[in-house]
């Protein structure tokens, strides 16, 4: 199978799906219509599925062999952002936007599902298509895993994202509340961070004769790819786009709850480039003007398919 050519046959479908999901975004754990639309597409393809944790969906495509079982995952939720683009398919849900590309992720996986369904006779494995809710809440993956159905870096990012204090401009505030996030790749360093942060808070408050309360909640672990799966993925990209289509880098401090899957199963998390300044697709994720180059939908769907075909021969 020439994967890229097979996926290109469905480019119009991929674009239409992406625009439909972009037009109707839903927040984490509220993806009712999104899930229903995904399930209708799976019904039309004749792919059976299970409804998981309400708005999650796990579809199963059986090949000639039961094993290995290989999962392809996408996230489906949107963000609480008021869209500021003038796109004809801009959000119709005021104050909610697919500003992180999840509309594209859904489209890519559904397109990959179509191609894989067309070529079931070439599958020597069982495929799990995982449509995960609530990635932005960072607990959707863990909730799905809890149902039972499914290198050394020292980077640390500490972000203070909110600061609330006071009620009026002419009244001194008695209290202030700050909140934020912490991200690191190093599990041992992650354990040390609460003490490191509290020491800074304590010394700062002592300098100003203030009291403090410190609450620290552990959230998602670092997303660390399996080396073997990464090698398979790299070869898959080269088959589709050539050597120039592959970009490798050490890591990024962005948060991603796919890490819960990687804690339990060997796997790989990859980015699909979608920036194209000539088309106005130049804003970063979570920006009110974010948009993606829809040509990337073909590359993403093709990667899903090619990786599946390559991985089934390696496990």
Predicted segments — roles?
Residues 6, 10, 16-20, 37, ...:
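Generic non-transmembrane alpha-helical segments
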Residues 91-100, 247-248, 287-294:
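Short pre-catalytic strand/loop immediately N-terminal to key active-site residues, enriched for Gly-Thr
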Residues 2-98, 107-110, 114-124:
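Acidic/His- and Gly-rich active-site-bordering loop/insert found
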Residues 136, 142-228, 252-253, 259:
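Midchain, well-structured core segments that form catalytic/ion-binding scaffolds
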Residues 215, 219-274:
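Active-site-adjacent substrate-binding region
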Residues 21, 59, 72, 102, ...:
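Divalent metal-coordination and catalytic microenvironments
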Residues 199, 242-244, 273-315:
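His/Asp/Glu-rich mid-to-C-terminal helical/loop segments that flank catalytic regions of hydrolases
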Residues 104-156:
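Acidic/histidine-rich catalytic neighborhood of metal-dependent amide-processing enzymes
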């Amino acid at each position: 199978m020439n994967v890229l050519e097979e996926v290109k046959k469905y480019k119009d479908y991929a674009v239409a799906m992406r625009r439909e999901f972009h037009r109707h975004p839903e927040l984490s754990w509220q993806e009712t219509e999104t899930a229903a639309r995904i399930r209708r597409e799976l019904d039309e393809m004749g792919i059976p599925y299970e409804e998981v944790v309400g708005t999650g969906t796990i579809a199963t495509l059986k090949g000639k062999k039961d094993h290995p079982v290989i999962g392809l995952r996408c996230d489906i939720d949107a963000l609480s952002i008021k869209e500021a683009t003038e796109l004809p398919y801009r959000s119709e849900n005021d104050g909610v936007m697919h500003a992180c590309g999840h509309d594209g992720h859904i489209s890519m996986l559904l397109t990959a599902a179509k191609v894989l369904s067309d070529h079931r006779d070439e599958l020597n494995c069982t495929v799990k298509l995982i449509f995960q809710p609530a990635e932005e809440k960072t607990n959707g993956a863990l909730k799905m895993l809890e149902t039972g159905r499914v290198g050394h870096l020292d980077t640390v990012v500490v972000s203070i994202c909110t600061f609330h204090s006071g009620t009026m401009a002419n009244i001194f505030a008695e209290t202030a509340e700050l909140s934020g996030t912490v991200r690191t790749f190093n599990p041992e360093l992650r354990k040390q961070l609460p003490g490191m942060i509290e020491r800074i808070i304590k010394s700062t408050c002592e300098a100003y004769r203030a009291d403090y309360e410190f609450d620290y909640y552990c959230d998602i672990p670092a997303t660390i790819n399996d080396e073997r799966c990464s090698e398979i993925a790299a070869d898959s990209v080269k088959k589709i786009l050539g050597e120039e289509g592959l970009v490798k880098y050490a890591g990024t401090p962005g948060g991603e709850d796919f890490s819960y899957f990687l804690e339990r199963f060997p796997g790989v998390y990859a980015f699909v480039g979608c920036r194209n300044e000539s088309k106005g697709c130049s804003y970063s994720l979570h920006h009110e003007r974010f948009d993606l180059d829809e040509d990337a939908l073909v590359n993403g769907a093709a990667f899903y398919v090619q990786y599946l075909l390559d991985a089934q021969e390696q496990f």
